[in-house]
C-alpha cells in the first residue's frame, strides 16, 4: 500500500496516497485500500471539542479506518483510560497500529472485527459511529454497548433518504415515510433521531440529543443514552410525532398521526412525513459548555468555521419550531422578490437564522406573523 503522511489537528498519520489510486485523473477516498476523507476534518475537529468536554473513560471508535478519529480524541481531547480502535479491514488495522504508535499511544486496543460483533462484546461510555453511508446498521449494537448515561455519536452521509429524495430507501433504512419538503435539511436529522429512539426502546433505553448539526453532505449527532422502559415510553409519547407541510400556502406544524389533515390556513391536505423526533436538537447546558470551551481549540484549521457555526446554533437553539425556508415559502405565496433575511429577522424581532439553510429562519412566532413580514417587505 502506497502511503503519505498527513497532519490533522495535533497528530500526524499515514494514509493511502491518492496518487496511487486515481482513475482517469480522479480520486475518491472509497477507492483506496483504507478509507481517509480529508473533507471530514471539520467533523473531526468539532468532535474533538465535544469529547474534551465529555472526558469518557472508554472510547470506542468502531469504524476506525486509519484510526484518525480515535487517535485525535486521545491526543487532543482526553487521555481516556481505554481506547478501542476497530475496523474489519485488515489493511486498516495494520495502519491503525502504525498510526497509534507514531502518536505515542501504546495502550490502544486494536481489533479486526465486524463493528456489530465488537459492539456486542464491549461496554463503553463513548462510542463513535462514523460509517461510509448510513449509520442504521449500527444503531442497535452501539446503543447496546453504551453504559448508563453513556454517549453515542453518529455520522450520517446518506442524506438522500433522510431528506426525502429517496422515499423508498428512507422507509427501508429508517422506517419512516418521507418526501422532499421545504425544511428537509432539518427534518432529515429529526427522522434519524426518531429511528434511534425507536431502536433504543427495543433495549428498554432511550436517547436525548446533546448536540447535533448539519454540514456539507452529512449529519453529526451526539446522544446521551438513558436506561429504563418508562423513560423510553415517555420519550416516545412526548417526542415522536409526524410533520405536516401545506403544499399550497407553506404552513407547517407537527401533527399527531399520519392521516389526511387539512391545513388550518387554506384547507389544502398536508404533505406528511414521519415518524420523527420533535424535541430539542441541543442540550442548552451542554451547548453552553461548548461555547465556553471552544476558544481553547483555536489551533484547529477549521476553527473559524466552527466559531461561525456555533454562533448560529447558539441563537437558533432556543426556538422549538422547525425553521421556515423563506425562499420556498415566498414561492408558495407567489412572491418573486424575496426580502433580505436580515430585514425579515428585524421585522419579526424574536427570530434567528439557522445553520441548516442560508434562507432559513427559526422563530416560535405564528405563520401569520411570518407571512405578514414577508409581504410587507417585498
Curated annotation (Swiss-Prot):
Keywords in UniProt for this one?
Answer: Metal-binding, Methyltransferase, RNA-binding, S-adenosyl-L-methionine, Transferase, tRNA processing, tRNA-binding, Zinc
In its UniProt record, which GO terms are filed under biological process? Answer: tRNA N2-guanine methylation
| Enzyme Commission number(s) from the entry | 2.1.1.216
- Positions binding Zn(2+) in this chain are 246, 249, 263, 266
Q: Show the Gene3D superfamilies listed in the entry.
A: N2,N2-dimethylguanosine tRNA methyltransferase, C-terminal domain (3.30.56.70), Vaccinia Virus protein VP39 (3.40.50.150)
Judged by the first EC level, this protein's enzyme class is transferase
Q: Which SUPFAM superfamilies match?
A: S-adenosyl-L-methionine-dependent methyltransferases (SSF53335)
Domain Trm1 methyltransferase per the UniProt entry, residue ranges: 4-374
Q: Which reaction does it catalyse?
A: guanosine(26) in tRNA + 2 S-adenosyl-L-methionine = N(2)-dimethylguanosine(26) in tRNA + 2 S-adenosyl-L-homocysteine + 2 H(+)
Q: Which InterPro entries match?
A: SAM-dependent_MTases_sf, Trm1, TRM1_arc_bac, tRNA_met_Trm1_C
Positions annotated to bind S-adenosyl-L-methionine? 44, 69, 87, 114-115
Q: Which family does it belong to?
A: Belongs to the class I-like SAM-binding methyltransferase superfamily. Trm1 family.
Q: Which HAMAP family match?
A: tRNA_dimethyltr_TRM1
Any idea what job this protein has?
A: Dimethylates a single guanine residue at position 26 of a number of tRNAs using S-adenosyl-L-methionine as donor of the methyl groups.
What's the protein name? tRNA (guanine(26)-N(2))-dimethyltransferase
Q: What is the lineage of its organism?
A: Archaea, Thermoproteota, Thermoprotei, Sulfolobales, Sulfolobaceae
Q: Gene for this protein? A: trm1
Amino acid at each position: 500500500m502506497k502511503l503519505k503522511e498527513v497532519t490533522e489537528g495535533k497528530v500526524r498519520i499515514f494514509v493511502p496516497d491518492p496518487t496511487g489510486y486515481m482513475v482517469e485523473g480522479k480520486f475518491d477516498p472509497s477507492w483506496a485500500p483504507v478509507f481517509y476523507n480529508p473533507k471530514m476534518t471539520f467533523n473531526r475537529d468539532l468532535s474533538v471539542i465535544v469529547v474534551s468536554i465529555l472526558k469518557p473513560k472508554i472510547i470506542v471508535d468502531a469504524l476506525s479506518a486509519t484510526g484518525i478519529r480515535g487517535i485525535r480524541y486521545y491526543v487532543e481531547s482526553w487521555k481516556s483510560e481505554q481506547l478501542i480502535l476497530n475496523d474489519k479491514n485488515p489493511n486498516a488495522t495494520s495502519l491503525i497500529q502504525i498510526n497509534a504508535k507514531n502518536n505515542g499511544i501504546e495502550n490502544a486496543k486494536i481489533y479486526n472485527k465486524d463493528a456489530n460483533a465488537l459492539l456486542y462484546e464491549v461496554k463503553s461510555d463513548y462510542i463513535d459511529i462514523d460509517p461510509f453511508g448510513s449509520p442504521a446498521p449500527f444503531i442497535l449494537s452501539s446503543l447496546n454497548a453504551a453504559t448508563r448515561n453513556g454517549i453515542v455519536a453518529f455520522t450520517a452521509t446518506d442524506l438522500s433518504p433522510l431528506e426525502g429524495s429517496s422515499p423508498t430507501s428512507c422507509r427501508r433504512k429508517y422506517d419512516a415515510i418521507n418526501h422532499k419538503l421545504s425544511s428537509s435539511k432539518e427534518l432529515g436529522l429529526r427522522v434519524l433521531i426518531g429511528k434511534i429512539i425507536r431502536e433504543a426502546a427495543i433495549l428498554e433505553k432511550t436517547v436525548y440529543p446533546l448536540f447535533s448539526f448539519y454540514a456539507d453532505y452529512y449529519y453529526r449527532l451526539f446522544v446521551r443514552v438513558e436506561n429504563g422502559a418508562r423513560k423510553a415510553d415517555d420519550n416516545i409519547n412526548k417526542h415522536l410525532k409526524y410533520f405536516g407541510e401545506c403544499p399550497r400556502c407553506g404552513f407547517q406544524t407537527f401533527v399527531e398521526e399520519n392521516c389526511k389533515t387539512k391545513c388550518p390556513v387554506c384547507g389544502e391536505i398536508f404533505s406528511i412525513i414521519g415518524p420523527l423526533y420533535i424535541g430539542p436538537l441541543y442540550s442548552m447546558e451542554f451547548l453552553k459548555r461548548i461555547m465556553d470551551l471552544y476558544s481553547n481549540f483555536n489551533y484547529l484549521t477549521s476553527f473559524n468555521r466552527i466559531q461561525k457555526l456555533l454562533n448560529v446554533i447558539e441563537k437558533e437553539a432556543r426556538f422549538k419550531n422547525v425553521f421556515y425556508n423563506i425562499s420556498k415559502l415566498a414561492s408558495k405565496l407567489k412572491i418573486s422578490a424575496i426580502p433580505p433575511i436580515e430585514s425579515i429577522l428585524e421585522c419579526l424581532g424574536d427570530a434567528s437564522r439557522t445553520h441548516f439553510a442560508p434562507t432559513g429562519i427559526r422563530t416560535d412566532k405564528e405563520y401569520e406573523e411570518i407571512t405578514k413580514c414577508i409581504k410587507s417587505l417585498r
